[in-house]
Design a protein with these regions (language model features):
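A short, flexible low-complexity segment enriched in Lys/Arg and Gly/Pro that occurs
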Residues: 19-40, 83-85, 203, 207, ...
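A structural signal for short, well-ordered beta-strand segments
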Residues: 21, 63, 132-134, 193, ...
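C-terminal substrate-recognition/cap domain of FAD-linked oxidoreductases
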Residues: 69, 75-257, 261, 265
Length: 316
């Protein structure tokens, strides 16, 4: 996969972190490019081709990864915002002031926080319609970073915020974010969407898609959270008291509403978790005929007998 995760802002996605790859091909041949070169223009970049191919081209057996020194200073803040536009706008403000020290910027909807707080048996840090969990990090020990962040937030009208004063308080804030996935199980069966959008259109998508879903599916519950730093959102929907069968019956209809709004906003239907089986039939909507022909040709060149993870990623 080409996941990014909580620290994607600072460290990038898997594509950015893999310097070399060793892989076994479908015919048993071995491709080994484990030398940790930062630049190599001798031919096609097979490493980047294999990353995100979902096991359809080869089996990766080893990798050379880029590593970073562990930060010596962390400053973590939970910030409430009165609108999603304000929450999204905060990202550019903090980046402008703190640059690469901003390592995490997580968007959390109020419903997601409500569920996680109950599950974690922890009080919500602040009360607001929208929330941001952000973290600064520095390679050097610093005593002034927290004060600078607090002052900057106040300067820009974000006075509904909490800054962690200790390692345990930092962990409490992160636990609220990390427990969302487990907490939402209390709502029953989830129709999940792993999507990404241009950051400047996240607010537009949330507004238009939410309105369309609520108009079409009475009582639908939406749990939204994600890595706003690269536009990735976990957009999960729950139908009232849905059983497994109920959810599956509505899944295609819900997905159609969500994905149509994603595409209308210039986004993608697969951000981190890949295409797999269930999204294959959407690929012609997000990739051109020329791109699909090239992908099919690459697959055939690597795996002419279709033995590598057949039925995944590419449409029939």
């Amino acid at each position: 996969c080409n996941a990014g995760g909580l620290n994607v802002l600072r460290y990038g996605t898997m594509r950015d972190l893999v310097l070399g790859i060793e892989a076994v091909l479908p015919d048993g041949g071995l491709v080994s490019q484990l030398v940790p070169l930062h630049k190599n223009t001798t031919g096609y970049d097979l490493r980047q081709l294999l990353i995100g191919s979902e096991g359809t081209l080869a089996v990766i057996t080893a990798a050379t990864l880029k590593l970073f020194p562990l930060p010596q200073t962390y400053e973590t803040a939970w910030v409430g915002a009165d609108s999603i536009d304000r929450a999204v706008g905060l990202l550019a403000l903090v980046q402008q002031r703190f640059g690469e020290r901003l390592t995490s910027f997580e968007l959390v909807g109020s419903r997601a926080l409500e569920l996680s707080a109950a599950y974690s048996r922890s009080a919500a840090p602040v009360s607001a319609p929208w929330h941001v969990l952000l973290e600064l990090a520095d390679a050097e020990p610093r005593d002034d970073l927290g004060g600078l962040l607090a002052e900057y937030l106040l300067q820009h009208g974000f006075d509904n915020s909490v800054l962690a004063q200790s390692a345990s308080e930092r962990q409490t804030l992160w636990t609220l974010r990390e427990n969302i996935s487990a907490a939402q199980r209390s709502l029953g069966v989830s129709i999940k969407h792993d999507i990404a959008l241009p950051i400047e259109r996240v607010a537009e998508f949330v507004g238009s898609c939410g309105a369309a879903l609520r108009q079409t599916f009475a009582g639908i519950d939406i749990v939204l959270f994600g890595h706003l730093g690269d536009g990735s959102l976990h957009y999960n929907t729950f139908l009232p008291a849905a059983t497994n069968n109920d959810a599956y019956a509505y899944e295609d209809a819900v997905n159609t509403v969500v994905y149509e709004h994603v595409l209308a906003c210039g986004g993608t239907i697969a951000a981190e978790h890949g295409v797999g089986i269930v999204k294959r039939h959407w690929l012609p909507r997000v990739r051109s005929a020329a791109e699909l022909r090239l992908m099919g040709a690459v697959k055939a060149a690597f795996d002419p007998h279709n033995i590598m993870n057949p039925g995944k990623l590419l449409p029939d």
